[in-house]
Amino acid sequence: MNSKWQLLLGRVLLSVIFILSGLGKLPHFHDVAGMMAGKGIPLASVALVITLLIEIGGGLMLLTGYKARYAALVIAVWMVPVTLVFHNFWAVPAAQQQDQMINFLKNLAIIGGLLVTASASSAAVTSKK
């Protein structure tokens, strides 16, 4: 498989978690906003709308290749505070630490993949560079 198709496959695989995560939040908007407020997120409903735009919109941009570099960079930057706030394994009870550390490290790996995507060669299969 040449690198052009590897980049396409990588983008498609990265997009799935964001699209499905965003779509999964839609029917539970008020519950998710309440959970976000409980984590100390100000204007949780507004923050959730932004989250949905980033997850669904950015995920679709990754999937289709439309401005994929920009989408990958925006999602990566957004994931930093999300990871620190929602997967703070150092501040949870011992019974939750392992699961939260795995999610924290998973997010770091996803951020790494997004940064690679953002810096990928313009030879990638995409609708717009």
Where are these regions (language model features)?
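Extended, low-polarity transmembrane helix blocks
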Residues: 1-27, 37, 45-53, 57-129
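Cytosolic, membrane-interface loops and tails of multi-pass inner-membrane proteins
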Residues: 32-39
